[in-house]
Amino acid sequence: MERQARGLLETQSLHEADEDMVTDVDFTSMISEEEKEELKAELAKLEDEISTLRQVLAAKEKHLIEIKQKLGMSLMNELKQNFSKSWHDMQTTSAYKKTHETLSHAGQKATAAISNVGTAISKKFGDMRSHSISYSIRHSISMPAMRNSPTFKSFEEKVETTVTSLKTKVGGTSHTGGSFEEVLSSTAHASAQSSLAGTRLPESEEELQC
């Protein structure tokens, strides 16, 4: 095995050496003067043809620009057309289609989530409004019932009695009846008159003493 490996290595090194020798060989010494002249003539001919082709290409490009200008095709329009074509080509690729489908699916999920949140908020506000309305209805219904209760009537009678006694003290005429709001108003008025009478009594006594 070792001998075979060494033989292969020696063969490869000899082959590489032969290639190096070939590249270093000067081919000019292997051709005749006539062949050199023919090759030089062919080279000059090729250079002339290339130069002519370049001139023809430049003339054709100039003519192309003139035609586009006459047709109103500007450079910007050409760029737009190229961009549109590139965009169309990109949209037809499988990678773009897969990415577009993924983003579309994600957008649908986001829209559904936002819709669910909006529905929940609307439902919450609706429940709060219904609760407020029902509370107002219960409150309006419970007020007459409360005023007709024995406890409230007893309190109302006590207030009326107090108003009557206050009016008697200040020399007013006593009368019963009326709504509870009128009774409370009469109580406040009677209390004010009682306070005013209390402040005037000492002045009368001082005048009598004088």
From Swiss-Prot:
GO cellular component, one term: cytoplasm
Phylogenetic lineage: Eukaryota, Metazoa, Chordata, Craniata, Vertebrata
GO biological process, one term: positive regulation of apoptotic signaling pathway
Assembly with partners or alone: Forms a homodimer or heterodimer with other members of the family.
UniProt KW keywords: Coiled coil
Pfam families: TPD52
Protein family according to the UniProt entry: Belongs to the TPD52 family.
Coiled coil: 22-73
Ranges of biased composition (kind: Polar residues): 185-197
Protein name: Tumor protein D53 homolog
Species of origin: Gallus gallus
